[in-house]
Amino acid sequence: MAQVAIITASDSGIGKECALLLAQQGFDIGITWHSDEEGAKDTACEVVSHGVRAEIVQLDLGKLPEGAQALEKLIQRLGRIDVLVNNAGAMTKAPFLDMAFDEWRKIFTVDVDGAFLCSQIAARQMVKQGQGGRIINITSVHEHTPLPDASAYTAAKHALGGLTKAMALELVRHKILVNAVAPGAIATPMNGMDDSDVKPDAEPSIPLRRFGATHEIASLVAWLCSEGANYTTGQSLIVDGGFMLANPQFNPE
């Protein structure tokens, strides 16, 4: 039986690119979508073109714990799970003094509670299978540094980074490796961009002077799912074009 990778929110952007790269590595792919079913179907068609299997399910992490049960159905359809990529997320911006509690909770529900439940479902199945596995949490560069006027998003990504480390320590005995990938400014639909926006000098405030492409995140995820990453767990790997190196003294030329 082929190995199985499930990528949440793989109807577009980083999630879709992860699905395609893992399909190229021979994984059968589980695809989840929240509001873009057509995008999920498009991802599935491209996955199948690589000679592997694709299954689709709607996943609503805004309604928990019931919403996460869709992941169990997807695992049942595919027969197993070897990789989970927690890519689904939500964000909102508002000054801290104006942040409404219900908006705060919406972000934490999806970004933290949803990742916790999906990881727990996946890890329990991996333990049952007895062959280890990989869990990759897509966090953000703002797991490490705050995003102005986005206290909920910043706090949620910090929490997901902490969860990554806690899971890594507890699950290593089951040969389940857990890591985070922390993207910087990536050209995704969530950011109102696509790959056409990845061009030289488009963003001089970033030392590499451009936005990142989705494949530059997905390629790291794919490596974390490979044998080359067998000694890597509990890490948060930043992919940000040098953003974290730029301080107020950084002077783009």
Per-segment meaning from a language model:
Residues 145, 233-253:
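Short C-terminal tail/terminal secondary-structure segment
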Residues 124, 169-170, 230:
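Alpha-helical segment proximal to the catalytic Tyr-Lys
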Residues 11-13:
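Conserved glycine-rich cofactor-binding loop
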Residues 119, 156, 164:
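Active-site helix of classical SDR
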Residues 140:
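Residue(s) in the substrate-gating loop at a strand-loop-helix junction
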